[in-house]
Amino acid sequence: MLTKYALVAVIVLCLTVLGFTLLVGDSLCEFTVKERNIEFKAVLAYEPKK
């Protein structure tokens, strides 16, 4: 039963990050979440359009 809730939590987290990424679009270069002793960091590596 616990794994079912953990799976739902991971799916909700992924959907939240995906939604946030779609909302901010091109202005997102780095996203960091710090929670007690856990740090989640996403960095977007890209080449600007010329």
Swiss-Prot record:
Membrane association type: Single-pass membrane protein
One Gene Ontology CC term in the entry: plasma membrane
Localization (cell): Cell inner membrane
Spans through the membrane: 5-25
Primary location class: membrane
Stored InterPro entries: Hok/gef_toxin (IPR000021), Hok/gef_toxin_CS (IPR018084)
Record's keyword terms, sorted: Cell inner membrane, Cell membrane, Membrane, Toxin-antitoxin system, Transmembrane, Transmembrane helix
Keyword Transmembrane: yes
Coiled coil region boundaries: none
Lineage: superkingdom: Bacteria
Family membership: Belongs to the Hok/Gef family.
Protein function: Toxic component of a type I toxin-antitoxin (TA) system. When overexpressed kills cells within minutes; causes collapse of the transmembrane potential and arrest of respiration. Its toxic effect is probably neutralized by an antisense antitoxin Sok RNA.
Protein's name according to its UniProt entry: Protein HokE
Organism (species): Shigella flexneri
